[in-house]
């Protein structure tokens, strides 16, 4: 533990390292010589001058240099002036040993305030720690009134120094020595003692009934009646009951709960009702009225009712899977990657799998669960399951169960955390103590209630985690900069895709301030985001749109028109409820408040003749696959006038030619003192209500923030820190991002949206992927049944990797290695969002900008376009020119994650405007052939060499 403490001290004080340790490599030479990887990493750190890069690599140093190298860490620690300069006066320092998890304990000892531990020390699992800190904080306030009167201060501090409630003699002593010194101190102490009345041991007698063994229950009651101090009582219970105080043990849970200060029941000052809009989103997914009503009550009036009752009635109710999964998304969103667990080691090194809770706390929780179950009983909200000694009966299987329920792997169609039924039945048949089973209780009946499915996409298959991952290498083909979250508790972590200032190093992530989705919510959204949240009345179908303000609160809320969720859709004689998805022929559809919203794909009828199938183009209205492009008023290029008319545009709403072939600033529509700048966009709202301008008028700025990094490249291939600087210098934008040598000269490409771009950089800048080299000249495939004659003359580029089975996007000619989503959306909702945003149209760029934040792996990026059938097509593809199979798999998993969030209506995604208008999604993935690399060790070796060369060139 001391080694970990030294490591943490180093990480907290990395800015001092640059001043001192960089001049002295003796720590590396003398104490890391036997571990080459550690010595190399240590020496690299010693030579770095960039503080940002130093900080990033320092955070990774423990993965190269284990904490067992205590002399190394002591040496490093001693090289840091100020390493021990934490605030010794922090009142919580004396509480740190009460922390349950080792990581929380370490952070607590290095903290300067409660804010420093909020990310690692969770209030729901570290109750004793936070109760102690709260008590010490109150003591610090009260005793500060003593001023320089040391005797008064000492008697005051004695009241707050122990876990016990203050005794009568302690209170009398404070009054005697402090009454004349400071009446405010007396008043403060009286307020504290009124909130924390003296707790008698016999007040906790009811907790004894929570013990599982009869002899423990009797001993508990005897101890509480005969012993007085809390230490004596705790020692006696540990001795008599034979178990340590684990937080999952119902007996100890009860004692901890009894120690908490009672709620303020003063009728004159009722608690302020706090709202959790994120959880309230989920309440409308409940299938039973009792769970819906309980969910609404605890989401709109936080603190008026415990979640325990809700958990008992709803948490393990199979019919409430949608509700429970939604709440799990809000509490613990699924994230890619898992590593650095010390107990659940088989879950490590899984960079392309999704987990809800891969962290030190859950790792410790799994260990505690296993210890608790070793007592012979598994306590669940609905039942107790008697088991044999699991330390002898399938211990590895039980360890995997404990880890799976704590680490919580996520799967595509259900992100709930239940093990598969067959695993449940197997382990209870072998290790269930049938002599103690309740009447009519069998392994099958237990598992029908707790693990009702064997669908591998809806449950956790234990065999996957009974052995270690095959990816044992630490080489970072796929990294997760934001997992675990490195940012403060009030900030969100975003992947850094902007890069660094020229000549500087930077971290692979950046932190942005956020807002909670309600006073009681833990769910954060980024500043300036527009959110759709339920109204306070919690009436189904009634929402308001708010903005996350700079104050950290939701502001400027405007109510949306309510929609009737009780209305159903009548389709082909069948009734479809609001929010349900279905198909009509080949078209995906969704019912929204009584209206069926469907895509407009062209379908081949089952009774079509061979001639009809031969002539079928897959284009709207059976249009010919001739490429004579027209530019519609929504900013989208369509392959022909026939297609544009068929999808709803009049002849006055389109012109012949592709949209990028026109200069929106000619003639100049701006005022004399303004400059016209092209700003091409594809709008998703009605043109009759919300015009879709392709330019903006900007005034030449007088000055710009050079430190604000959002790089852009001009037509002279000169890079500027941001668009403001480019406009200040009077340059013309070529594309966003750093200038690339590969795009220095024009080389036309055709993108998936049917537009031709001068360079691939221009296409990527508009977040659209490339179909083939050269100017667009063909109508791509719109249907698997359609003719591909238009693509016959197109030379497709080679696939990025021979290892992938590619997908072909709608309207494209060439396949790509990517995960693809085809999203159905509600135009009426888009129009409402535009109306509430000062009549600003909603664009495809707005969609892509938000979705991009949900892609957590830097090796993958998002691209998208509007198909001619008005579906939003999203591609999540590797950014490397020659991606590894693991990177392709990671991109597919990112697409799978977003697809699942859309189809489940998870508030983690659809609370963001305009993503709230999403109805459903169809997923296609690029599968990966495992034979792409002859040997994992060879692949790892090649990648390691590449990494070393890259690091060497950077340094």
From Swiss-Prot:
UniProt tissue specificity: Expressed in the cerebral endothelium.
Protein's organism: Danio rerio (Zebrafish)
Residue span(s) of the pro-peptide: 932-955
Membrane topology designation: Lipid-anchor; GPI-anchor
SUPFAM superfamilies: Kazal-type serine protease inhibitors
Stated role: Functions together with adgra2 to enable brain endothelial cells to selectively respond to Wnt7 signals (wnt7a or wnt7b). Plays a key role in Wnt7-specific responses: required for central nervous system (CNS) angiogenesis and blood-brain barrier regulation. Acts as a Wnt7-specific coactivator of canonical Wnt signaling by decoding Wnt ligands: acts by interacting specifically with the disordered linker region of Wnt7, thereby conferring ligand selectivity for Wnt7. Adgra2 is then required to deliver reck-bound Wnt7 to frizzled by assembling a higher-order RECK-ADGRA2-Fzd-LRP5-LRP6 complex.
Gene Ontology CC entries for this record: plasma membrane; side of membrane; Wnt signalosome
Region (5 X Knot repeats): 28-326
Family in the record: Belongs to the RECK family.
Domain of life of the native organism: Eukaryota
SMART domains reported for this sequence: KAZAL
Site description Reactive bond, residues in chain: 625-626, 706-707
Subunit structure: Interacts (via knot repeats) with wnt7a (via disordered linker region); the interaction is direct. Interacts (via knot repeats) with wnt7b (via disordered linker region); the interaction is direct. Interacts with adgra2; the interaction is direct.
Domain comment in the entry: The Kazal-like domains mediate the serine protease inhibitor activity.
Record-annotated Kazal-like domain positions: 615-661, 686-741, 742-778
Protein name (record): Reversion-inducing cysteine-rich protein with Kazal motifs
Lipoprotein in keyword set: yes
Lipidation (GPI-anchor amidated serine): 931
Disulfide bond annotation, renumbered to this chain: 621-646, 623-642, 631-659, 704-724, 713-739
């Amino acid at each position: 533990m001391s080694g970990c403490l030294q490591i943490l001290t180093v990480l907290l004080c990395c800015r001092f390292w640059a001043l001192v340790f960089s001049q002295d490599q003796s720590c590396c030479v003398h104490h890391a010589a036997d571990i080459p990887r550690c010595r190399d990493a240590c020496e690299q750190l010693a030579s770095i001058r960039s503080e940002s890069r130093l900080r990033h690599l320092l955070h990774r140093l423990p993965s190269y240099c284990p904490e067992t190298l205590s002399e190394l860490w002591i040496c490093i620690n001693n090289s840091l002036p100020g390493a021990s300069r934490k605030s010794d006066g922090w009142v919580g320092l004396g509480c740190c040993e009460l922390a349950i998890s080792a990581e929380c304990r370490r952070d607590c000892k290095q903290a300067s305030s409660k804010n420093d531990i909020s990310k690692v020390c969770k209030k729901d699992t570290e109750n004793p720690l936070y109760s102690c800190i709260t008590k010490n904080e109150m003591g610090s306030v009260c005793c500060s009134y003593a001023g320089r009167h040391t005797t008064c201060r000492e008697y005051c501090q004695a009241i707050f120094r122990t876990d016990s409630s203050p005794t009568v003699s302690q209170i009398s002593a404070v009054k005697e020595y402090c009454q004349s010194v400071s009446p405010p101190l007396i008043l403060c102490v009286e307020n504290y003692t009124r909130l924390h009345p003296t707790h008698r041991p016999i007040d906790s007698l009811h907790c004894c009934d929570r013990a599982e063994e009869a002899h423990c229950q009797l001993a508990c009651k005897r101890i509480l009646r005969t012993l007085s101090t809390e230490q004596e009582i705790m020692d006696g219970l540990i001795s008599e009951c034979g178990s340590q105080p684990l937080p999952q043990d119902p007996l100890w849970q009860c004692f901890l709960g009894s120690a908490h200060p009672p709620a303020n029941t003063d009728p004159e000052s009722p608690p302020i009702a706090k709202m959790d809009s994120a959880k309230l989103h989920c309440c409308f997914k409940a299938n039973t009225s009792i769970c819906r009503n309980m969910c609404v009550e605890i989401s709109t009036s936080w603190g008026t009712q415990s979640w325990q009752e809700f958990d008992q009635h709803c948490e393990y109710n199979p019919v409430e899977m949608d509700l429970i999964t939604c709440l799990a998304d809000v509490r613990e969103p699924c994230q890619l990657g898992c590593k650095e667990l010390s107990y659940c080691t088989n879950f490590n090194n899984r960079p392309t799998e999704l987990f809800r809770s891969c962290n030190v706390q859950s790792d410790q929780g799994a260990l505690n669960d296993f210890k608790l179950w070793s007592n012979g009983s598994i306590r669940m909200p609905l039942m107790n399951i008697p088991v044999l000694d699991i330390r002898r009966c399938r211990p590895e299987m039980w360890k995997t169960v404990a880890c799976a329920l704590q680490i919580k792997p996520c799967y595509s169609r259900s992100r709930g955390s239940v093990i598969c039924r067959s695993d449940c039945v197997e382990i209870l048949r072998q290790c269930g103590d049938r002599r103690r089973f309740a009447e009519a209780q069998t392994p099958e009946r237990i598992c029908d209630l707790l693990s009702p499915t064997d669908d591998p996409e809806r449950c956790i298959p234990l065999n996957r985690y009974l052995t270690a991952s095959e990816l044992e290498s630490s080489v970072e083909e796929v990294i997760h900069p934001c997992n675990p979250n490195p940012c403060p508790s009030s900030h969100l972590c975003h992947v850094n895709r902007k890069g660094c200032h020229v000549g500087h190093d930077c971290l692979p992530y950046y932190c942005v301030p956020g807002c909670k989705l309600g006073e009681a919510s833990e769910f954060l959204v980024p500043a300036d985001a527009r959110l759709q949240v339920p109204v306070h009345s919690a009436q189904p179908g009634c929402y308001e749109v708010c903005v996350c303000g700079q104050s950290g609160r939701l502001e400027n809320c405007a109510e949306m028109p309510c929609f009737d969720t009780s209305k159903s859709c009548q389709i082909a004689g069948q009734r479809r409820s609001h929010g349900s998805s279905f198909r009509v022929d080949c078209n995906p559809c969704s019912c929204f408040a009584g209206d069926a919203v469907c895509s407009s794909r062209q379908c081949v009828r089952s009774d079509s003749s061979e001639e009809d199938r031969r002539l079928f183009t897959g284009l709207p209205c059976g249009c010919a696959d001739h490429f004579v492009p027209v530019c519609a008023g929504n900013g989208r290029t369509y392959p022909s006038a026939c297609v544009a008319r068929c999808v709803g545009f009049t002849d006055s709403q389109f012109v012949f030619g592709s949209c990028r072939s026109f200069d929106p600033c000619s003639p100049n529509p701006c005022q004399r003192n303004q400059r016209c700048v092209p700003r091409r966009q594809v709008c998703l709202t009605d043109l009759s209500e919300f015009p879709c301008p392709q330019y903006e008028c900007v005034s030449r700025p007088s000055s710009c923030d050079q430190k604000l990094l959002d790089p852009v490249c001009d037509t002279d291939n000169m890079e500027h820190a941001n668009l403001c600087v480019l406009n200040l210098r009077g340059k013309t934008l070529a594309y966003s991002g750093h200038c690339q040598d590969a795009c220095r000269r024009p080389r036309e490409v055709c993108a998936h949206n049917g537009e031709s771009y001068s360079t691939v950089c221009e296409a990527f800048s508009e977040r659209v992927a490339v179909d083939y080299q050269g100017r667009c000249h063909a109508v791509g495939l719109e249907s698997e049944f359609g003719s591909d004659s238009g693509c016959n003359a197109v030379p497709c580029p080679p696939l990025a990797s021979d290892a992938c089975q590619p997908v072909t996007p709608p309207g494209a000619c060439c396949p790509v290695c990517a995960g693809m989503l085809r999203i159905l959306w509600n135009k009426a909702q888009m129009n409402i969002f535009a109306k509430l945003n000062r009549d600003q149209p909603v664009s495809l760029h707005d969609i892509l900008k938000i979705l991009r934040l949900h892609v957590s792996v830097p090796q993958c990026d998002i691209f998208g376009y509007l198909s001619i059938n008005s579906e939003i097509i999203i591609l999540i593809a590797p950014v490397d020119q020659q991606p590894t199979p693991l990177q392709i798999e990671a991109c597919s998993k990112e697409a799978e994650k977003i697809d699942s969030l859309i189809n489940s209506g998870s508030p983690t995604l659809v609370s963001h405007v305009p993503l709230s208008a999403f109805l459903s999604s169809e997923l296609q993935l690029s599968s990966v052939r495992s034979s792409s690399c002859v040997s994992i060790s060879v692949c790892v070796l090649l990648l390691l060499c590449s990494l070393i060369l890259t690091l060497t060139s950077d340094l």
